[in-house]
C-alpha cells in the first residue's frame, strides 16, 4: 500500500511539473508578441524559463524514482526548491506590490488572468508550490539551503540595477527605475525585496519539512 501511495505521489508530481513545461511554449510566444526581446529583462520571464527547465529534470527524475524506488537526488530537489522560490516571488510580488499599483483596481485581474501572465504569474507558481510542498518532501533539505534560494534574485537584481544605472534599460519594474526615485528609496526597495524573498524561501523550506541539521 505504501509503495502504491508513493507511486501515485510521484505521478502527481510528474503531472504538475510537466504542466509547467507544457505551459511555457504557450506563454512565451504571448510574451514575445508583447515585448519581443525586451521580455528577457523581466524576472517573471527568466524565472519561468528557468523553472520549466528544472521541472523537466524533476519529471524525469521522478519517473526514474518510480522504477528504482530511490528518492530524488538532493541537488535536484534543491534546484526545484530554488525554482519554486522564484515563482513564489513572482506570484506574491504581483499580489502584494504590482497588482495594487494599478489605479483602476483591475491590477490583480490583468496581471494574474490575462495573456501569458495567467501562466507565468498564477498557474505555474501554484503548480510549483503545490508539487514542492505536498508531493516532493524528500530528501529533506537542510536549513542552509534557504540562502541559495536568494541567488537568482540577487543575480537578476544586480544586473538589472546596473543596466538601469547605465541607462541601458528603464525598469522594467517601477521600483527598479533608479532615476525616478531617490537613492534611499532604491536601497529600501532592494532590502524589502530581499527580505520578502528570504521569508518566502524560509516558509517554503518549512512547509516542505526541511531539517535544521546540516547535510
Tell me the role of every PLM-derived stretch:
Residues 42, 165-206:
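Membrane-interface transmembrane-helix boundary segments in multi-pass integral membrane proteins
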Residues 69-88, 142-151:
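Interfacial segments of alpha-helical transmembrane regions
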Residues 58-68, 89-106, 130-134:
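Membrane-helix exit/interface motif
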Residues 114-126, 191:
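Membrane-interface loop-to-helix entry segments
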Residues 1-19:
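N-terminal membrane topogenic signal
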Residues 17-32, 164:
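Alpha-helical transmembrane segments of multi-pass membrane proteins
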Residues 123-141:
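Alpha-helical transmembrane segments in multipass membrane proteins, preferentially the mid-helix core
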Residues 37-45, 74-76, 104-119, 142-146, ...:
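Non-cytosolic membrane-interface motifs at loop->transmembrane helix junctions
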Amino acid at each position: 500500500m505504501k509503495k502504491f501511495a508513493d507511486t501515485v505521489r510521484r505521478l502527481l508530481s510528474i503531472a504538475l511539473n510537466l504542466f509547467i513545461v507544457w505551459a511555457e511554449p504557450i506563454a512565451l510566444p504571448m510574451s514575445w508578441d508583447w515585448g519581443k526581446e525586451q521580455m528577457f529583462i523581466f524576472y517573471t520571464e527568466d524565472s519561468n524559463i528557468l523553472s520549466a527547465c528544472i521541472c523537466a529534470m524533476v519529471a524525469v527524475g521522478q519517473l526514474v524514482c518510480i522504477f528504482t524506488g530511490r528518492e530524488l537526488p538532493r541537488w535536484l530537489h534543491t534546484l526545484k526548491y530554488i525554482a519554486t522560490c522564484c515563482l513564489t516571488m513572482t506570484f506574491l510580488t504581483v499580489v502584494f506590490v504590482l497588482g495594487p499599483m494599478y489605479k483602476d483596481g483591475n491590477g490583480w485581474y490583468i496581471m494574474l488572468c490575462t495573456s501569458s501572465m495567467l501562466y507565468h504569474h498564477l498557474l505555474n507558481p501554484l503548480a510549483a508550490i503545490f508539487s514542492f510542498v505536498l508531493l516532493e518532501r524528500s530528501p529533506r533539505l537542510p536549513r542552509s539551503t534557504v540562502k541559495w534560494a536568494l541567488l537568482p534574485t540577487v543575480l537578476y537584481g544586480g544586473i538589472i540595477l546596473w543596466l538601469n544605472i547605465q541607462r541601458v534599460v528603464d525598469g522594467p519594474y517601477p521600483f527598479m527605475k533608479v532615476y525616478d526615485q531617490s537613492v534611499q528609496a532604491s536601497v529600501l526597495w532592494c532590502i524589502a525585496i530581499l527580505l520578502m524573498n528570504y521569508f518566502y524561501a524560509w516558509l517554503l523550506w518549512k512547509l516542505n519539512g526541511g531539517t535544521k541539521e546540516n547535510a
